[in-house]
Amino acid sequence: APMEPVYPGDNATPEQMAQYAAELRRYINMLTRPRY
């Protein structure tokens, strides 16, 4: 199973938040991908 991205914290930089958001979206896509 893919690793869940770690929340960078409330005082993270916008770049860190954007990176986290992108990783989280990819993680969720991997979890919800249908397995035929």
From Swiss-Prot:
Belongs to the NPY family. GO terms for biological process: feeding behavior; neuropeptide signaling pathway. SMART domains: PAH. GO terms for molecular function: neuropeptide hormone activity; neuropeptide Y receptor binding. The lineage of its organism: Eukaryota, Metazoa, Chordata, Craniata, Vertebrata. It is found in: Secreted. The modification Tyrosine amide is found at residue 36. The keyword Transmembrane helix does not apply. CDD domains: PAH. The keyword Secreted applies. Signal peptide: none annotated. This is Pancreatic polypeptide. It holds the Pfam family Hormone_3. Hormone secreted by pancreatic cells that acts as a regulator of pancreatic and gastrointestinal functions probably by signaling through the G protein-coupled receptor NPY4R2. Keywords: Amidation, Hormone, Secreted. InterPro entries: Pancreatic_hormone-like, Pancreatic_hormone-like_CS. GO terms for cellular component: extracellular space.
